[in-house]
Regions:
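S-adenosyl-L-methionine/SAH cofactor-binding core of RNA-modifying enzymes
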Residues: 63-114, 120, 157
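Hydrophobic/aromatic beta-strand patches that form the interior of the parallel beta-sheet core
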Residues: 4-6, 34-36, 82-84, 108-109, ...
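Structured adenosyl-cofactor binding patch, chiefly the S-adenosyl-L-methionine
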Residues: 118, 122-169
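Short, surface-exposed acidic-centric catalytic microdomains
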Residues: 35-56
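Internal, active-site/partner-interface "lid" segment
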Residues: 143, 155-194
Length: 249
């Protein structure tokens, strides 16, 4: 997968190109990234990419023309993929959406806004989808872009061990269960005994019940979604009836 990023701060992306799973996957050729600074296509001495908003108000707005010129260069270089921008008013990013993008096998272009935002005319004519990573405001689109890239790369076959995907939050429709490692006792707290016995059937049962319990307590909406998608077993439903308040079906 090829990902092109339009950003005023290309150096920020070293965090994902030089470290961790994303770096290793990049070195193995599973994905590639190109960073494009719209200042490089400006024609004035100040390399201007922003201006005051019409109608007044605080801050500056990123101009449409430098972004359009940068996108034209990306298209000419061979990336014809979907264009994504980032803003709190966008569609909430979900694991399901990430998996859809990976399954499509298509390239992506990510536009990272700054200041008060991007001229709406560019968004209307050239951006296919605006994504939000939560109900809060950041200084720019670079951090959301890196969040999305990390989530995407993890789903590319070969990026991480296959079994890791199976146990991650959302892969089964539920949140992940708690994890423990050595020592067995830390600050007088023991690892749950079931994890020390080596009985894999019991461990699997405990893990599933922990996932159910955590999901019910923190994301009950996911229980309803998993039920609607047929991801809850009869054993799951029995545990829910016995251990939680009645849930709507």
């Amino acid at each position: 997968m090829r990902i092109d990023v339009i950003t005023l701060f290309p150096e920020i992306f070293a965090a994902i190109t030089d470290s961790g799973i994303t770096s290793r996957a990049k070195k193995r050729g599973l994905w590639s990234i190109e960073r494009w600074n719209p200042r490089d296509v400006t024609e004035d001495n100040h390399r201007t990419v922003d201006d005051r908003p019409f109608g007044g108000g605080p801050g500056m707005v990123m101009m449409a023309e430098p972004l359009k010129r940068t996108l034209d260069l990306i298209r000419t270089s061979g990336n014809r993929g979907r264009v994504i921008s980032f803003a709190p008013n966008g569609t909430r990013l979900t694991d399901e959406k990430v998996r859809e993008w990976v399954a499509s096998g298509g390239d992506l272009v990510m536009v990272c806004g700054r200041y008060e935002g991007i001229d709406q005319r560019f968004l209307d004519h050239y951006v296919d989808e605006t994504v939000s990573i939560g109900d809060f405001v950041l200084s720019g689109g670079e951090l959301p872009a890196m969040v999305l890239i990390d989530a995407i790369v993890r789903q590319i076959p070969g990026a991480i061990k296959e079994l890791s995907h199976l146990d991650e939050s959302f892969s089964t429709g539920l949140l992940d269960a708690p994890h423990y490692t050595r020592p067995e006792v830390w600050e007088d707290v023991r690892v749950p005994e079931v994890l020390l016995r080596g009985n894999h059937a019991n461990i699997n049962k405990w893990t599933r019940e922990q996932s159910l319990d955590l999901t019910v307590k923190t994301r009950p909406d996911l229980i309803e979604k998993a039920r609607a998608e047929g991801k809850l077993t009869k054993s799951d439903e029995k545990w829910l009836r016995e251990n939680t308040q009645p849930l709507k079906k």
